[in-house]
Amino acid sequence: MILFSSEIEFELRDKIKMNKLIIDGASEKIFLMIISNANIYNITHENTKINYEKLTIIINDFVLSKNIKITDINAIYINQGSGSFAGIRNSISVVKAFKVAKNIDYYCYNLDDFKDEKDLSHENIPNLCKKYKIKKNLINPAYLS
């Protein structure tokens, strides 16, 4: 049997599990979403000092509850503002730690980057980052004063 490159690519894409984690700590609630191929999971937590201090634990528990390990995450998308200074700062710190410890690439987006878009839902963020060529591993937060 001969397979053409597009068929091989399609077969490989089906076998490779793409797990994306979206973290939004800029709002009133800490929002987490996992996009795992065809499945989408999300959870929210109160945006409080206690939750900031245990953000890594919250993320790890959420990921494990979906039978995924942190090392299975291919990319992290993080809202870098505008919004809560503490939420953004803590989210960025956790994501940078994941980058250093597990070598997971991250993409810092700002909703202003996508101002001409109609669908700003969290599940669309990876596609918007790709469309607008958001650079990976670059942080430029926008805090509210």
Regions found by a protein language model. Name each.
Residues A75-Q80, F85-Y106:
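DPxDG-like acidic metal-binding loop motif
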Residues I23-K29, V63-K66, G83:
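Short, functional N-terminal and low-complexity linear motifs
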Residues M1-I57, D105-S145:
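Oxyanion-binding and handling regions
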Residues I70, S91, Y109-D113:
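Residue-level detector of alpha-helical recognition elements and their boundaries
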Residues F62, K66, S93-V95, K99-A101, ...:
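Stable alpha-helical structural segments in soluble proteins, enriched in small hydrophobic residues
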Residues I59-A75:
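Phosphate/pyrophosphate-binding loops at sites that engage ATP/ADP/AMP, CoA/4′-phosphopantetheine
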